[in-house]
Design a protein with these regions (language model features):
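Short hydrophobic/aromatic patch on the recognition helix
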Residues: 46, 192-193, 241-242, 246
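Flexible coil/turn residues that form the inter-helical turn or adjacent wing/linker of helix-turn-helix
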Residues: 39, 174, 223-224
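Terminal helix-turn-helix DNA-binding modules in bacterial transcription factors
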Residues: 198-240, 256-263
Length: 263
């Protein structure tokens, strides 16, 4: 549900891992590198990186760095639509795999709240989960302020759009059509298209295609699957159709992509 550990407390943090949690990596001292899917990012002192649920990641060159990793599930944090919108505000955990390193000028706030979260989890005082939820809110607000201060455009998607993305991510193997996703969310295809165009400039169907292509890349890089197995994992009945789909969206065949990037 929620956990926080310093870098040296995590076993095998230098091995690729995938969590159905939202991950926040905080560097308080030194430097380290983080691989997220196929992208390498460098964190320096007082910088933070957010990783969306399902993204594969691991640390590199972190032995001399200090910091911690906070992980929490969507069920723990998102009690209402306001929580959903905060967690994805300004692309914090909804960046379509364009992870970014964020420098925090007012770093003392983040450092203090992370330390207090760790203390709450250790001692478990009365209503500690409520306290932790509030402290995560403070951290996310501080990160949002840092992004605004550096000139980033404010991006605040509607909760429905975020539920749409999460539904697709949670059901890759079912290969839901847009109609099926809309039905699960109790809305319409037209409404999802409206939200998708508003927040991404793309149709809802193209958002789905993009999410599937990103998931295919993860499976090709980090899992010991053949192209055929990846196709079936993503709900494609025809591996040839999957190969054409992947090449259209990635600009390279799945076999070539796997040969180029696989560990």
């Amino acid at each position: 549900m929620i956990d926080i550990k310093s870098f040296n407390e995590y076993p095998d943090i230098d091995k690729p891992r995938r969590l159905r949690k939202y991950v926040l990596i905080w560097c308080s001292k030194g430097t380290l590198k983080v691989m997220v899917d196929e992208t390498e990012l460098k964190l320096k002192e007082h910088e933070v990186l957010t990783i969306t649920s399902g993204q594969i990641h691991y640390l590199k060159n972190y032995r001399k760095a200090e910091g911690c990793i906070l992980e929490f599930t969507v069920d723990f944090f998102c009690k209402n639509d306001n929580d959903i919108e905060l967690i994805f505000h300004n692309g914090l955990f909804c960046h379509f795999d364009l992870n970014e390193v964020i420098k925090i000028p007012n770093h003392g706030v983040v450092q203090t709240q992370l330390e207090l979260i760790k203390k709450e989890l250790l001692l478990k005082p009365y209503q500690h989960y409520i306290s932790i939820h509030s402290r995560i809110e403070l951290i996310l607000v501080e990160i949002n302020r840092a992004k605004v201060e550096r000139g980033d455009e404010i991006w605040k998607p509607d909760a429905l759009f975020l539920k749409f993305i999460e539904t697709v991510r949670a059901n890759f193997n079912k290969n839901y059509s847009l109609e099926q996703v809309a039905r699960k969310l109790g809305t319409t295809e037209a409404k999802l298209n409206e939200q998708s165009k508003l927040h991404t400039g793309r149709t809802a169907q193209n958002v789905i295609y993009g999410l599937i292509a990103s998931e295919a890349k993860r499976l090709l890089i980090y899992q010991n699957y053949s192209v055929k197995e990846v196709a079936y994992q993503l709900g494609f009945n025809d591996p040839f159709y999957f190969s054409n789909f992947f090449k259209k969206h990635a600009g390279i065949s799945p076999k070539s992509y796997q040969s180029k990037y696989a560990l």
